[in-house]
Amino acid sequence: MTVRIPMGVVAREILAGALVLAGVVLGIAGTLAFRSAQTTIDPHRPEAASTLVVDGIYRFTRNPMYLGLAIILLGWAVYLAAPPTFAGPVLFGLYITAFQIVPEERALAAKFGPEYAAYRERVRRWL
């Protein structure tokens, strides 16, 4: 038996689509900021970053690409309208924070020192 959250199909699809679109836009904005700064986008090698990107979308969130993925997952959950699917974005956020973001932050702190510390104080991790 599937439990569904009551919401008009059209309204749900519009909301889901808007969330997915917002997530894609965030991801693209993050990618373009890295390309503009001519630095690596490889999440497995944050120590290879040649520049600390703090402009554009990075003025509002330190992790627009991960935030974009979480919002896409939220859009998918809204589209499916099944309560268990809403765990996806939460679990993704917890996992990516522990196993990707925190290690990236350590590498960036080691590489950029006080500049990264000031950025970290100024801009939130997610929102």
What function would you assign to each model-found segment?
Residues 1-55, 67-127:
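Membrane-anchoring alpha-helices and their flanking helix-loop junctions
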Residues 58:
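Solvent-exposed interhelical
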Residues 63:
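Extended, alpha-helix-rich binding/interface surfaces that flank or overlap catalytic cores
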